Structure formats: structure tokens, C-alpha cells
Amino acid sequence: MKVWVHFVFSLAIGIILYPIFGWKALFVLAGGVLIDLDHYLWYAYRHKKANFFEAYKYYLKNLEKNDFTSDIGILLVFHTIEFLALMIVLSFYGEAFFLFTIGLLLHYLLDAVFLYFVAKRLIADYSLVHWVLKNKIQKV
């Protein structure tokens, strides 16, 4: 899903929550948008290039061209159940973590809707443990 969609939806939820949480509502925006940095981290690891704009262009061009299958099996650490569990635990210890987790959940929801209706599939590797075990088994 394109970053602007995550931005718009996260901004809308942040605006709704602003009267309650004030400026901290910006953490919803951070949680809803910044977790896609793991796409960049994977690109940098896989292609040995640290160019953010090249990574962005790569994902925009290749995902749709390959019918949204070129990202199957990649590890997106911020899109894992373990990261979500960590954020849920941390959300009990501060408003900022709580609001970030709201943005994160919104991001996951938008990704799930996109994957189901547009890419016609569900998330492939939703767990860090699953990804490590699967890749370790495949290498043996």
C-alpha cells in the first residue's frame, strides 16, 4: 500500500484523538507511517544500497509490475506479531506508546485490507520466529 494512504488515515485518527491527547496524538501518525521503514531496511540489506529514494522507487515499480508478489517471503520486522506484542506491552507504560500502537494497528488493518482485496492474498511472514525457522529449514 502506498505511504500516502497510511499518512491520510493516520492523520485523520490523530486529528480525532487530538482533543483528548493533544500533541501526543502525533504518535498515531508515527505508528501508522514510520513502520514502513522496515521495507527500506530490507531493501538496503538485500540490495546493499542505502539510498532511501531508490528503495521507494523500487517498491512502487516492482510490486505492481509483479502482481504484488515480489515482497512474499521478505522479513519486515515492524510488521511482525512480535513487534506488535512488544508495542502492546509498552502501551501500558505510556501514552506515547499507546498512541503509537493505535497507529500501528491502523497500519496493519489497512495493509490487510489492501492485501486481501488488491493483491488477493494475506501477509506471508507475519512472525519473526516463523521467518527465521522457515529460512533456516530451507537452507539445510
Residue ranges and their predicted role:
Residues M1-V140:
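N-terminal membrane-targeting hydrophobic helices
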